[in-house]
């Protein structure tokens, strides 16, 4: 899956063994920037992480509270510039505080429009998977993510306080 705009061409792939170095480079940069990122629970064990991603894709052997999820690595050329996650159902927690989608952009590639493009392509993936609308949620102080969601047609439904994370979130729906 590709799309072009400006000086980058995004390619979405489900992770394989061949993505090891590029994925680890991406997550190392995120960690060095002091940030956290969706999708990388096993920082020191790529094989375990890859097995976890495959199980999520298949919807098998999921930890309690987890749902079937497709997790994509987003490339620009040979470099991982971001990640995208699509969850296929909403638990009560996801309905209130998590949503259907998650995405992140490599710190050195932020402010290039990549997040907007990742979400737009993610919407295409969701549409082809039978979704009619997506729930996108961001922390109320994450103005960059809020801007991305709104650019992609997000309509604010409400804000909720997440007592587990001790943060207020904004809940947006995007019609597909």
Language-model region placement:
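GNAT-family acyltransferases
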Residues: 2-100, 125, 169-176
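Short coil/turn motifs at secondary-structure junctions
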Residues: 89-91, 108, 141
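Conserved beta-strand-loop-alpha-helix junction that forms the acyl-donor binding cleft
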Residues: 110, 136-146
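Conserved G/P- and acidic residue-centered "switch" motifs that form tight phosphate/ATP-binding loops
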Residues: 113, 130, 142
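Conserved GNAT acetyl-CoA-binding A-motif
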Residues: 126-137
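Structural motif
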Residues: 129, 151-152
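Conserved catalytic-core motifs of GNAT/GCN5-like acyltransferases
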Residues: 137-138, 153-171
């Amino acid at each position: 899956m590709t799309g072009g705009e400006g000086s980058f061409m995004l390619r979405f792939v489900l992770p394989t063994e061949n993505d090891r170095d590029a994925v680890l480079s991406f997550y190392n940069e995120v960690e060095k920037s002091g940030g956290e990122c969706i999708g990388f629970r096993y920082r020191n064990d790529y094989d375990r992480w890859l097995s976890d991603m495959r199980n999520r894709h298949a919807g098998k052997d999921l930890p309690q509270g987890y749902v079937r999820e497709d997790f994509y690595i987003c490339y620009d050329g040979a470099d991982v510039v971001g990640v995208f996650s699509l969850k296929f159902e909403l638990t009560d927690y996801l309905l209130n505080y998590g949503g259907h989608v998650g995405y992140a952009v490599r710190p050195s590639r932020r402010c290039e429009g990549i997040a907007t493009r990742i979400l737009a392509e993610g919407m295409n993936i969701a549409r082809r998977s039978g979704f009619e609308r997506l729930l996108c949620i961001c922390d109320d102080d994450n103005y960059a993510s809020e801007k991305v969601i709104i650019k992609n047609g997000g309509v604010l439904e409400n804000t909720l306080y997440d007592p587990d994370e001790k943060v207020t979130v904004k809940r947006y729906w995007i019609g597909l």
